[in-house]
Amino acid sequence: MYKLLDTITGPADLKNIPREELPGLADEIRRFLIETVSQTGGHLASNLGAVELSVALHYCFDSPADKLIWDVGHQAYTHKILTGRRESFHTQRQYKGISGFPKRSESPHDAFGAGHSSTSISAGLGMAAAQDLKGSGSRAIAVIGDGSLTGGMAYEALNQAGHLKKNLIVVLNDNEMSISQNVGAFSSFVSRKMTGSDFRKLKKEMQGLLENIPAIGKDILHFARRAENSLKGFLTPGMLFEALGFDYIGPIPGHDLPQLLEVFENVKGLEGPVLVHVMTTKGKGYQPAEENPAAFHGVGPFDVATGKTTGGKPGAASYTGVFGATLVKLAEEDEKIIAITAAMPDGTGLTPFAKRFPERFFDVGIAEQHALTFAAGLAADGFRPVTAIYSTFLQRAYDQVFHDVCLQKLPVTMALDRGGLVGDDGPTHHGTFDLSYLRHLPEMTLMAPKDENELQHMLKTAIYAGRPVALRYPRGAGYGLPLDQTIQSLEIGRGELLTEGDDVAIVAIGSTVYPAQEAAKLLEARGIRATVVNARFVKPLDRELILGAARRTGCIVTVEENALQGGFGSAVLELLADEGMTDVRAKRIGIPDRFIEQGPQPQLRKDLGLDGAGIAATVEAFLTAKGQAALSLVK
């Protein structure tokens, strides 16, 4: 089916293919990617643009001795295919399948794990320093997209790399035209020649000769360097990288394999940090993806002939969609409401806001730290900023939440999308730690809705709370409930009593409330009567409601889609302990102390006992356990 690709089980096989046949291999890989991702879903457009680049890197370097580090991982599919995972590639991002991102435990060729952006240069520099200390002679190559260069960490690494002068190669895969370009035959010619060994040797010899000429030698050398830099600056956009201490090579046409091979072979012999600027086309080779790369950045299963997604049926609105629509509705009535995103306007539901209020919408790029402090600045001057961000990415701005928002008591709303289990993207993207790392911050209010209707009321509550608020909601569709036409503010710190029973109190937060209600029905069929509480707020807790339920039943079970350590259940246990209620038996249900792999959300919840049946089984086993200590901390 694939004449060349079928012969490859690892990088060594790739090197047996004649160079003139490599473009044909790239075509086969591209066809394989389209056919496979159309069935599984995944990050298609970026990977189609990085096929030739990946082939050239593996052809010229020797993985795993040479360390290939892929930033984020959105462009690493060809790398996975060439390193022995083609046969299992149909399982990528699937339950118990291979990861959609580089993963050290998956292959020795995955030198460094990823999923979040802008980390590759730092990791690559560390590996370059390690190779230097070991004297191994291996190279470290960091591949980073131009989008990731909006993250400040990348520049921190570039700055130190230029200072340390280690043998680090940074490949800038520029597929968005966001860096000024000057591509042409002459520029490509100069880039190739400036990396050639003859040119580099001649340059060093001339430098030594000029330095030894009495009186005027250094002046001539200084003039020559200025002339070289002027020429390169005229032809290329690399002066920034040169100023940071890198040898800049490029721009190079990223789909021209002969040029890529020549440049990488030359670069292998260079000393010190080098940046190779490669221009690629996102979605290359598949017309629907080339025409609409944003839609094919992360895509579900689709029909190859038309490019249209398959299997999707109209259903309940997503939490993200309800959030975005509600924010627009509130902003219609309040011109002080501002929306901020960190390079995720579509993913966070802010595109409608951006179109309706472009002057009040800010996309700060992949810069979560800046996003929070930028919001704090707006809040300090009287505005009501709402920063929409995936829960997992807020971890990158923790100090800003503390220092710039909470410490100064500024009214910033943090809308945490993808709170809890996210599904196919796995452990790098699950938002299962936010309740733990936010609830102990002074001045923080932390809430989570049970459904999409409650979400809209909580959003208004957060915006007008006059204090720092984190509003956490899950990925995916809601329950298809009708939305109240009038949006109201909720009383902060007030939960909701859903059902009353005398045997056990189940106190749930956010996405676990409906499963808790389902569990109560299953328990009732077994003769166990449960009180069910929708906590609504992790901080402040509804002390009266929770303590009342504990007194009534003498047995309390908390449920959360968050890490058990320091989470919602821990907050409830602290409340019971502080009130001296040592006669109450307690049990926590949530995410255990491990990273959760990828898989469909319903499957993961079932595995973790977070669906209705699982909660009911845990509660029943807890109630019937013998010798259970009061205020048990047993998971």
From Swiss-Prot:
Mg(2+) binds at D146, N175. The keyword Transferase applies. The gene is dxs2. GO terms for biological process: 1-deoxy-D-xylulose 5-phosphate biosynthetic process; isopentenyl diphosphate biosynthetic process, methylerythritol 4-phosphate pathway; terpenoid biosynthetic process; thiamine biosynthetic process. It comes from the Bacteria. One of its GO terms (cellular component) is cytosol. It is an enzyme of class 2 (transferase). The keyword DNA-binding does not apply. Belongs to the transketolase family. DXPS subfamily. Pathway: Metabolic intermediate biosynthesis; 1-deoxy-D-xylulose 5-phosphate biosynthesis; 1-deoxy-D-xylulose 5-phosphate from D-glyceraldehyde 3-phosphate and pyruvate: step 1/1. Binds 1 Mg(2+) ion per subunit. Binds 1 thiamine pyrophosphate per subunit. Homodimer. Keywords: Isoprene biosynthesis, Magnesium, Metal-binding, Thiamine biosynthesis, Thiamine pyrophosphate, Transferase. This is 1-deoxy-D-xylulose-5-phosphate synthase 2. Its EC number is 2.2.1.7. Thiamine diphosphate binds at H74, G115, H116, S117, G147, S148, N175, Y286, E368. Its cofactor is Mg(2+); thiamine diphosphate. Signal peptide: none annotated. InterPro entries: Dxylulose-5-P_synthase (IPR005477), THDP-binding (IPR029061), Transketo_C/PFOR_II (IPR009014), Transketolase-like_Pyr-bd (IPR005475), Transketolase_C (IPR033248), Transketolase_CS (IPR049557). GO terms for molecular function: 1-deoxy-D-xylulose-5-phosphate synthase activity; magnesium ion binding; thiamine pyrophosphate binding. It catalyses: D-glyceraldehyde 3-phosphate + pyruvate + H(+) = 1-deoxy-D-xylulose 5-phosphate + CO2. Catalyzes the acyloin condensation reaction between C atoms 2 and 3 of pyruvate and glyceraldehyde 3-phosphate to yield 1-deoxy-D-xylulose-5-phosphate (DXP).
